[in-house]
Amino acid sequence: MAAVLGLCGGLGKRKFTRFPTAFVCLTNSGTRAVLWRSCSQCKQVTSSEDLPIPMENPYKEPLKKCILCEKRVDYKNVQLLSQFISPFTGCIYGRHITGLCGKKQREITKAIKRAQILGFMPVTYKDPAYLKDPKVCNIRYRE
């Protein structure tokens, strides 16, 4: 239903029989009055009541944080480092998969290479003892 705007000189009861249920009357002081057909009283609405309430965007997604920014990466922590290696090929996952920041991704890569050179980690596959570890990255493998 479209509302019809009726301009009134003052606030008075007017009978509108063939129009929609609400009319807006402008008074001399600048306030708006809403006239309802069903009720004989006029409700005055100030212009500040109709303004939207400022609030945060409810659809905004929270910012992604690097999960290792507060942690220290060590080449001897093989269980942590094995989470960032593919169990089938032994390749190191990239930033788009791990979700790490650039600084921590470089540290992880250097620590993995150092652990592989020093013999703490295998080069080609993930150690079977760590296959059932909780997943750090949200990666799904084909079964």
UniProtKB/Swiss-Prot annotation:
**Gene3D superfamilies recorded:** Ribosomal protein S18
Q: What is its main location?
A: mitochondrion
**What InterPro entries does UniProt report for this protein, alphabetically?**
Ribosomal_bS18 (IPR001648), Ribosomal_bS18_CS (IPR018275), Ribosomal_bS18_sf (IPR036870)
SUPFAM superfamilies, alphabetized? Ribosomal protein S18 (SSF46911)
Q: Which UniProt keywords apply?
A: Mitochondrion, Ribonucleoprotein, Ribosomal protein, Transit peptide
Named from the GO MF annotations, one term is: small ribosomal subunit rRNA binding
PROSITE patterns, per database record: RIBOSOMAL_S18
Q: Does the keyword Zinc-finger apply?
A: no
**Any one GO BP annotation for this protein:** translation
What are its GO cellular component terms?
Answer: mitochondrial inner membrane; mitochondrial small ribosomal subunit
Q: Which domain of life is it from?
A: Eukaryota
Tell where it localizes. Mitochondrion
Q: Which family does it belong to?
A: Belongs to the bacterial ribosomal protein bS18 family.
| Known partners and oligomeric status | Component of the mitochondrial ribosome small subunit (28S) which comprises a 12S rRNA and about 30 distinct proteins.
Q: What's the name of the protein?
A: Small ribosomal subunit protein bS18m
Which species expresses this protein natively?
Bos taurus
Tell me the lineage of the source organism: Eukaryota, Metazoa, Chordata, Craniata, Vertebrata
